[in-house]
Amino acid sequence: MVEQIKDKLGRPIRDLRLSVTDRCNFRCDYCMPKEVFGDDFVFLPKNELLTFDEMARIAKVYAELGVKKIRITGGEPLMRRDLDVLIAKLNQIDGIEDIGLTTNGLLLKKHGQKLYDAGLRRINVSLDAIDDTLFQSINNRNIKATTILEQIDYATSIGLNVKVNVVIQKGINDDQIIPMLEYFKDKHIEIRFIEFMDVGNDNGWDFSKVVTKDEMLTMIEQHFEIDPVEPKYFGEVAKYYRHKDNGVQFGLITSVSQSFCSTCTRARLSSDGKFYGCLFATADGFNVKAFIRSGVTDEELKEQFKALWQIRDDRYSDERTAQTVANRQRKKINMNYIGG
């Protein structure tokens, strides 16, 4: 029987974000800048990562508490060896209705078919520019946008449902909004533009670098005829619109200008096995990995997860001001540990 639990602000638990690795083959400035994550950076050793059996056990217990959706994140999750084994395990859990994966897309041709065969049907590909030169300057690994576009074409050809995520930074890639909308509209692929967020400690975020949803919408309406789309479910993070001529949808994620804390239903497990109730968490998370490895039963694990959720009161984006950003900037968990 599924228990219905809510946090201190009355929010149910519906989603679990599982970070499977802290490693990535890109060095995007807003997530893992090369100046910090250089060639000598020490990533987590394998024994510090949760095993797939541990992740599946955690997911099963969370399903009994109301989780219906699981998203696999990183780092770059396709760098975790044998990820299809985890997908297959998660697909066998009663109550889990949807498994998604967020990736930079570079390794889709290498691993996509195995993941599809294991039961993965839905992926989000992070792609912050369609211009090759600009994209290379963003990822700092000399990877061309055309390379990722080819990987996306491959993913759709094997049956994966693909959405594209774009983090927009003022003066960096805001000129990519219109060409990317045009490209993916013609491909009938949903694209979502995300306001630049102050996740982690190393991305140099401030308000002046944010292109708000209203600014994006004004730009878009000068080039396309669109209609708004009603939200599909409680907790949907994107504001969706539909192109009038062919019905393809796109989304704007208002993580800064119009926060969605009040409907956030996500629990997050970092790559080092810690629970966090918020993407912008500052305190050190509860060490689920150590708790599991201490020999607890599933019932004890469930009671701990219940307690963690019931004391949750995170609403950082609701409270974000220049001062709170300054006060918390050096204390947040980095994005490569917790995913997006």
From Swiss-Prot:
[4Fe-4S] cluster 1 binds at C24, C28, C31. S-adenosyl-L-methionine binds at Y30, G75, S126, M197. [4Fe-4S] cluster 2 binds at C261, C264, C278. Transmembrane segments: none annotated. Its cofactor is [4Fe-4S] cluster. It catalyses: GTP + AH2 + S-adenosyl-L-methionine = (8S)-3',8-cyclo-7,8-dihydroguanosine 5'-triphosphate + 5'-deoxyadenosine + L-methionine + A + H(+). It comes from the Bacteria. GO terms for molecular function: 4 iron, 4 sulfur cluster binding; cyclic pyranopterin monophosphate synthase activity; GTP 3',8'-cyclase activity; GTP binding; metal ion binding; S-adenosyl-L-methionine binding. Pathway: Cofactor biosynthesis; molybdopterin biosynthesis. Residues 8-227 form the Radical SAM core domain. Binds 2 [4Fe-4S] clusters. Binds 1 [4Fe-4S] cluster coordinated with 3 cysteines and an exchangeable S-adenosyl-L-methionine and 1 [4Fe-4S] cluster coordinated with 3 cysteines and the GTP-derived substrate. Gene3D superfamilies: Aldolase class I. Its EC number is 4.1.99.22. Keywords: 4Fe-4S, GTP-binding, Iron, Iron-sulfur, Lyase, Metal-binding, Molybdenum cofactor biosynthesis, Nucleotide-binding, S-adenosyl-L-methionine. Catalyzes the cyclization of GTP to (8S)-3',8-cyclo-7,8-dihydroguanosine 5'-triphosphate. Belongs to the radical SAM superfamily. MoaA family. Monomer and homodimer. HAMAP family: MoaA_B (MF_01225_B). PANTHER family: MOLYBDENUM COFACTOR BIOSYNTHESIS PROTEIN 1, MOLYBDOPTERIN COFACTOR SYNTHESIS PROTEIN A. This is GTP 3',8-cyclase. It comes from Staphylococcus aureus (strain MRSA252).
